[in-house]
C-alpha cells in the first residue's frame, strides 16, 4: 500500500529535481551574461515527458494523461516578443525547423518545409496566433507495458492503448480527462 507519506516524499523529491535543474539553468544564463553572449543566444527548455505522481493512482511516465504528456516549452530568442504564454500544442519535432530558421537569421529555408515539424518562429515572434496544433506520440516498451499512441489536435486528445478501449477527451471542457467521448455520436 502506498501511504500519504510515500506520496509526499515522492513529490518532494520530484520538485527537488526541478529546483536543481532550475539552479543549473540559472548558472548557464549567468555565464552567458558574464561573457556577453546572452543577447545572441537562443535558449529552449523542454522535456520529453512529465510524470504521474499518484494522480489516478498512476506513477511514472507510461501513459498519455496530461500530467505525463503535457510539458512546457520555454523559449528565449533574441529579438522575439517577450512574455508570450500560450496553450498552443507544439511538439519536439518543431524544434529542428525552428532552430534552423533562427540559424539562418529568420530567412525561410526551403529544406525545412520537408521536415515533420513546423518552425515556431512566426508564433514566437508574434506574427501568428495559431500554428498547426497537432502532436503525435507513442510509447512502446518490451515487458508489461502495451503499445500506446496519442494524437493531440487543438483541444482534443485521442489515446489508443493496444487491447483497451480508445479514449477521447475534450481538454478545454474536461482538463482532468474524466469524460471519455470515444463512444459519443
Task: Map each language-model feature to its residues.
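A long, amphipathic alpha-helix that forms part
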Residues: 2-41, 102
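Active-site rim elements
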Residues: 3-16, 60, 80-90, 103-111, ...
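Generic, ordered loop/turn and secondary-structure boundary motif
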Residues: 21, 38, 53-54, 59-60, ...
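C-terminal cap/loop subdomain of S1 sulfatases and analogous C-terminal strand-loop tails that border
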Residues: 49-55, 93-96, 101-171, 176
Amino acid at each position: 500500500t502506498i501511504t500519504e507519506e510515500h506520496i509526499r516524499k515522492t513529490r518532494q523529491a520530484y520538485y527537488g529535481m526541478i529546483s536543481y535543474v532550475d539552479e543549473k539553468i540559472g548558472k548557464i544564463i549567468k555565464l552567458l551574461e558574464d561573457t556577453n553572449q546572452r543577447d545572441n543566444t537562443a535558449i529552449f527548455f523542454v522535456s520529453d515527458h512529465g510524470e504521474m505522481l499518484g494522480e489516478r493512482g498512476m506513477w511514472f511516465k507510461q501513459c498519455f494523461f496530461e500530467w505525463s504528456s503535457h510539458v512546457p516549452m520555454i523559449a528565449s530568442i533574441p529579438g522575439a516578443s517577450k512574455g508570450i504564454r500560450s496553450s498552443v500544442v507544439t511538439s519536439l519535432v518543431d524544434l529542428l525547423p525552428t532552430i534552423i530558421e533562427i540559424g539562418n537569421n529568420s530567412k525561410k529555408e526551403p529544406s525545412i518545409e520537408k521536415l515533420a515539424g513546423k518552425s515556431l518562429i512566426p508564433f514566437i515572434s508574434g506574427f501568428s496566433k495559431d500554428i498547426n496544433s497537432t502532436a503525435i506520440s507513442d510509447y512502446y516498451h518490451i515487458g508489461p507495458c502495451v503499445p500506446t499512441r496519442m494524437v493531440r489536435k487543438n483541444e482534443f486528445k485521442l489515446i489508443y492503448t493496444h487491447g483497451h478501449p480508445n479514449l477521447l477527451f475534450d481538454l478545454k471542457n474536461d482538463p482532468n480527462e474524466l469524460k471519455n467521448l470515444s463512444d459519443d455520436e
